[in-house]
A protein has these predicted regions:
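HKD-type phospholipase D/PLD-like phosphodiesterase module
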Residues: 1-24, 30-158
Length: 158
C-alpha cells in the first residue's frame, strides 16, 4: 500500500468505514467532532468483534459547545474506552485514525454527517511505518496524559 488520498464529499465515508470494518487488532481514533452514525456503528461493531478500540474526543469547543457528548455516551455504553483529548491544550483539532498499527488516516474532516456529504475535506492514508509510529506515539502520550515530543527526526508536522 502506498499513500492514498480521500477527497470528500466525492469519496463518501466508504474508505473510512471499510478500514474500520477490516480492522483485526486495533482502532485508535482522535477526533474533534464525532456524530456520524455509520462510523459510530462501525466502531461499536469493531469492538464487539474483539478489536481493541480507543477513542479520544475533544471535550468542548471554545464557545462552550460540547459536540461529542452523544458519541462518548454511546461508545461508553458499549464498553469502548473513550477519553477526552489532552488537557494540555484548550482544544484538540486533530482528526486521525490508526488501524492495526499498520496504517493511519490524517484528516481535515470531522466525523459528522456534513463532512461526508457537503464539505470539501481530505484524508491522507499512510502505511509509512515512521509516520504511523509518530501518530501512535502522540495518541498514546495524550491518552496517558504525558508530554509528547516528536523530536528533531519527526517526519510529520506537529
Amino acid at each position: 500500500m502506498t499513500r492514498s488520498l480521500i477527497i470528500l464529499p466525492d469519496d463518501s465515508s466508504r474508505p473510512v468505514l471499510d478500514a474500520i470494518h477490516n480492522a483485526e487488532k486495533s482502532v485508535r481514533v482522535k477526533m474533534f467532532a464525532f456524530s456520524h452514525q455509520p462510523l459510530l456503528d462501525a466502531v461499536i461493531a469493531a469492538h464487539q468483534r474483539g478489536v481493541l478500540v480507543k477513542v479520544m474526543l475533544n471535550p468542548v469547543r471554545r464557545d462552550g459547545e460540547t459536540d461529542n457528548d452523544g458519541a462518548r455516551d454511546l461508545l461508553q455504553q458499549y464498553g469502548i474506552e473513550v477519553t477526552e483529548s489532552s488537557p494540555s491544550f484548550d482544544l484538540t483539532h486533530e482528526k486521525s485514525m490508526v488501524i492495526d498499527d499498520e496504517y493511519a488516516f490524517v484528516e481535515s474532516l470531522n466525523w459528522t454527517d456534513e463532512n461526508f456529504t457537503e464539505t470539501r475535506d481530505y484524508a491522507v492514508v499512510t502505511p509509512t511505518a515512521h509516520e504511523v509510529l509518530e501518530i501512535i506515539e502522540c495518541f498514546e502520550a495524550d491518552w496517558a496524559r504525558e508530554d509528547f515530543d516528536p523530536g528533531e527526526s519527526a517526519r510529520l508536522i506537529w
